[in-house]
Amino acid sequence: MTALRIGNGYDIHRLVGDRPLILGGVTIAHHLGLDGHSDADVLTHALMDALLGALSLGDIGHYFPPSDARWQGADSLKLLAQVHQLILERGWRINNLDNVIVAEQPKLKPHIQAMKENLAKVLTIDPDLIGIKATTNERLGPTGREEGIAAYSVALLIKEG
């Protein structure tokens, strides 16, 4: 029997001035960026939580607490590489990933392929195993009011051997 594990992740960060907007490791031209202790890449953060959750390893706050100065301004793709290593060490590999980014602005479709390629490179998987969609919240809630950007992720892992 094939062993499978599934994990879900979610993250949201406030939009502020004087910060870059980074999603999936892609810096996107926009007048606002995401506020956070690290680079505030909500897509990569949600994905890390999904991967950790699939193996009951807690969440990114456990591994990269905002109270720790080492993670100030950290590149989330480098943190993702560390999370990926935890999965590999336990004998699991990624079967596929599915992600949704919720943002009113900017339009993200032109950047999705680059996000997939960045994540795939770090995770050493084919970009076709990573789904990324962008949607709006139809002007409802904090993302709809353009106060922040959120991301949801699902990770399906398969046991090696």
UniProtKB/Swiss-Prot annotation:
What Enzyme Commission number(s) apply to this enzyme? 4.6.1.12
Q: How does it assemble?
A: Homotrimer.
Its function, per the record, reads:
Involved in the biosynthesis of isopentenyl diphosphate (IPP) and dimethylallyl diphosphate (DMAPP), two major building blocks of isoprenoid compounds. Catalyzes the conversion of 4-diphosphocytidyl-2-C-methyl-D-erythritol 2-phosphate (CDP-ME2P) to 2-C-methyl-D-erythritol 2,4-cyclodiphosphate (ME-CPP) with a corresponding release of cytidine 5-monophosphate (CMP).
The family classification in the record reads: Belongs to the IspF family.
Q: Which UniProt keywords apply?
A: Isoprene biosynthesis, Lyase, Metal-binding
For this chain's record, the cofactor binding note is: Binds 1 divalent metal cation per subunit.
Query: What cofactor is this protein dependent on?
Result: a divalent metal cation
Q: Which InterPro entries match?
A: MECDP_synthase, MECDP_synthase_CS, MECDP_synthase_sf
Q: Where is this site: Transition state stabilizer?
A: 37, 136
Q: Which PANTHER family match?
A: 2-C-METHYL-D-ERYTHRITOL 2,4-CYCLODIPHOSPHATE SYNTHASE, CHLOROPLASTIC (PTHR43181:SF1)
Pathway(s) this gene product operates in, as recorded in its UniProt entry: Isoprenoid biosynthesis; isopentenyl diphosphate biosynthesis via DXP pathway; isopentenyl diphosphate from 1-deoxy-D-xylulose 5-phosphate: step 4/6
| Top-rank taxon | Bacteria
| Reaction it catalyzes | 4-CDP-2-C-methyl-D-erythritol 2-phosphate = 2-C-methyl-D-erythritol 2,4-cyclic diphosphate + CMP
Q: Read off the PROSITE patterns from this record.
A: ISPF (PS01350)
> What name does this protein carry?
2-C-methyl-D-erythritol 2,4-cyclodiphosphate synthase
Ligand binding (a divalent metal cation): 11, 13, 45
Where exactly are the transmembrane stretches of this chain?
none
